[in-house]
Amino acid sequence: MKQVDRNVRSNDLSIAWPFAFTSVQLNRDTSLLKLIAMVTMLIDHAGKILFPQLPFMRVVGRLAFPLYAYCIAVGCVYTRNPLKYLSRIVLLALISQPIYAVALRHTVPSMYAYSFAEQPLRAAWAFYLGSWNHPSILVSLAAGVVLITTLKEKRISLFLGTALLCWIAQRYFDYGWHGLALMLLFYLCSNTRWLAIPVLGAYMIWWGAQGTGYSLFGLKFGIQMFAALALPLIFINTHSKMRMSQIFAYAFYPAHCAVIWALSEFLLK
């Protein structure tokens, strides 16, 4: 009996893992945030391919990634099945990659090394493999899910190993390690509003200050500075009660790439 009491007291004194969050204090209106992310991403990609003479479209597009990154962090907090959540993103990445590569003009000569008329299977395989020369943002989002989940579930060795691999392979991620770090910061700050505002604000300003091309009051900064404009949407609870179809949310990415490609073929040729 005494042994049991000692075990109970020992368990009571154990320290809970501080990164296993089960709730979010920041904006939980992720359907609205995803919609804004979709629209700004569409504007960004349309500006890059269809309207390069309108640079403000690329500025508007800077809001998309922080919103998606935040939604990934919130998804990791609330998902009951992290593996299923990750699998959906990976499957979407596998399906979308060739469409993305063609639409956003990330093609390479190896994609067209074989004739579809003469060697259709080999040509299709070469086309698909070559499209991965510049992976889409979905690969970064999938890596973010792995990093957050391994940290949340206290799999420290796996977390550190994944972080090291991501650091080594950062050239294959949109936004490099900066984007992966942002997803981690969103997760770590998601349950503490007073910490989120200064930490995320400082990080976004620091990130934007790394580039050039813009200036204000004599201070030079890059286009990524405009991504900080997404933070108020994340910090303020909007309560729109909007519900977005999961199918629509996932299908939008390859669909918008296909539309941009079709328009570029019709309008620019």
Q: At which residue positions do the language-model features occur?
A:
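Alpha-helical transmembrane segments and their immediate juxtamembrane cytosolic regions
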Residues: 1-269
